[in-house]
Amino acid sequence: MTEPKRGRVQWDEANIVEIESNKPVRQKITEPKTPYHPMMDDDGSLSPRGRAFDECVDDMQRAEELRNVLNDAAASSSRNSSQGSGGGGWSSSDEEEEEADPMDQDEEGSGSGKNERFNAHRKAHYDEFRKVKELRSSGSFYEEEEEEDDGAKGSKSETTTNSRHTKGGNKELDATKTVSGTSSSSSPELI
């Protein structure tokens, strides 16, 4: 027998026939396909546009009428609930807020004070980060920190730095030694 050529596949056809005969019978689906109905205009021609422009304008007018009715109902129910509860609950002292749409009041409502506080905290947080970044890039951050350390430890201790590494504007304080009469410690401090 000759050796098969490299890169060619030889099929064992007897094995394939045996596998096909042992396969289980599968159920055939006899359900008809879903029919497709293209959109058609009133005149019978195919068109990608579903409705006429006038019908859309009518829908917009109906939507505006519905919004007005809902706003009136919401305003009257809020007036009734504030009068019936003896002044308890939410009530507005401003004339403008009372005349505004109730739907708009939901968006601006009672969360505005909370939202303002959140924005103030967020602004302060990012400003603090920006200030630290500026101080680090100018190097004055480390000078201020050393002055604070000197003032806090008093006259008995002296702060010395072993080494500073500058790489891409980022300064790290590797080790700080505190020298005093009885104790000395060395601990890495990253900023």
From Swiss-Prot:
Q: Which GO terms describe its cellular component?
A: cytoplasm; nucleus
Q: In Gene Ontology terms, what is a biological process of this protein?
A: regulation of signal transduction
Single GO MF annotation? protein phosphatase inhibitor activity
Q: What is its main location?
A: nucleus
What post-translational events are described? Answer: Phosphorylated in vivo.
The biased composition feature labelled Acidic residues covers 93-109
State the deletion phenotype. Answer: No visible phenotype under normal growth conditions, but mutant seedlings exhibit hypersensitivity to abscisic acid (ABA) or salt treatments.
- Domain of life here? Eukaryota
Query: Where are the bilayer-spanning segments?
Result: none
Give the region (Disordered) as residue ranges: 20-52, 67-191
- InterPro entries named in the record: PPI-2
The tissues in which it is expressed are: Expressed in roots, cotyledons, leaves, flowers and siliques.
Q: What UniProt keywords apply to this chain's record, in alphabetical order?
A: Cytoplasm, Nucleus, Phosphoprotein, Protein phosphatase inhibitor
Basic and acidic residues biased stretches:
20-31, 114-136
- The answer to keyword Cytoplasm applying to this record is yes
Report the subcellular localization: Nucleus; Cytoplasm
| In-chain residues carrying the UniProt-annotated modification Phosphoserine | 45, 47
Quaternary structure? Interacts with protein phosphatase 1. Interacts with TOPP1, SRK2D/SNRK2.2, SRK2I/SNRK2.3, SRK2E/SNRK2.6, SRK2C/SNRK2.8 and PYL11.
Function according to Swiss-Prot or TrEMBL: Inhibitor of protein-phosphatase 1 (PP1). Binds to and inhibits PP1 activity. Acts as negative regulator of abscisic acid (ABA) signaling. Enhances the inhibition of SRK2E/SNRK2.6 by TOPP1. May promote the interaction between TOPP1 and the ABA receptor PYL11.
Name of this chain's protein: Protein phosphatase inhibitor 2
